Amino acid sequence: STKNYKKRLIQLGESPSRVYHVGAICNDNINNIKKFSKKRLEKDIGFKFKKRNIIVTLHPETTGGQFTEKKIKIFFKTLSKLKNVGIIATYPNIDAGNQLILKYLEKFAKENNNVKIIKSLGAQNYLKSLKICDGIIGNSSSGLLESPLLKKGSINVGLRQKGRDTCGSVIDTDFDSKKIYKALKKIFSKKFKNNCKKVKSPYIGKNVSHKIYKIIKSQKVQKLRNDKVFYDLR
């Protein structure tokens, strides 16, 4: 999905002739967004957009030590300061620790009338909502993939996405209230929004699905299986 990931696979011993860089598959989803009106989207998802809006998705961390209740509390308590911002919050995934996130997510929505919990927006409505919103906060891969491709800012909190390729529209921070709030102010700033428009995502690609299909179709599976050798870097 990126040139850097292609390089890493070759470093692991794969022959360069067998490794292809095509871009991330989400490029196709973005290019296939159907025309929509803001009013219709609001009706479809049951959410009234404000002047400023953000999408929130927090998943459990699977690396970097214990994903503590304290971190979750800090995250949602900081977001509670955004009184005049429309917040669309989606469910965490099913990794261990998701129930604790859900507990605080529901509490967060109950105490703040600018928050709308949507279990799953679906691919099309998610991308449409992101096009309207100012950006994303949390630790979803969408903050590294879809958000930069749509020229939107994202705040990547914690270690879940550590080690993945990123770009200038992504603000990395840990579970620290002051740092998160500082990042939030930045993501809504005119200067940062303008900078995001100039960012080139490392995941960019065209006709990704078709390229993958053509590559797979051109390969002889039995030959690939028999000719597998370790490639030494020169």
List the predicted regions and their residue ranges.
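Nucleotide-activated sugar donor-binding and catalytic core shared by glycosyltransferases
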Residues: 1-234
